[in-house]
Amino acid sequence: MVKKSKVGSTGRFGARYGRKAKRTVKDIEDKMHAKHVCPKCDRPGVKRTHAGIWKCRKCGAVFTGGAYIPTTPMGKVAKRNIKRITGGE
């Protein structure tokens, strides 16, 4: 029995581009296509429409975020600082 390879979405590249590059692409695409929670309605259903633009399928909210994930580490820091300055609303 042949051992099955777990190439995922990078199987489309075939033997090209090398193992490390394909692994990086697979990790990014897995994070991008995962279930993301909407910051407005707190429901999972956020989809990426363009690079950095995300839309909730439930409430229709459109917001910006990272290119591959809706919230970036710097965005989390900024949100925390704003909450601290305004009094934690």
From Swiss-Prot:
GO terms for cellular component: ribonucleoprotein complex; ribosome. Residues 1-28 are annotated as: Disordered. A zinc finger (C4-type) spans 38-59. The keyword Heme does not apply. Binds 1 zinc ion per subunit. GO terms for molecular function: large ribosomal subunit rRNA binding; structural constituent of ribosome; zinc ion binding. Its cofactor is Zn(2+). Keywords: Metal-binding, Ribonucleoprotein, Ribosomal protein, RNA-binding, Zinc, Zinc-finger. InterPro entries: Ribosomal_eL37/eL43, Ribosomal_eL43, Ribosomal_protein_eL43, Ribosomal_zn-bd. NCBIfam families: eL43_euk_arch, PRK03976.1. Belongs to the eukaryotic ribosomal protein eL43 family. This is Large ribosomal subunit protein eL43. It comes from Methanosphaera stadtmanae (strain ATCC 43021 / DSM 3091 / JCM 11832 / MCB-3).
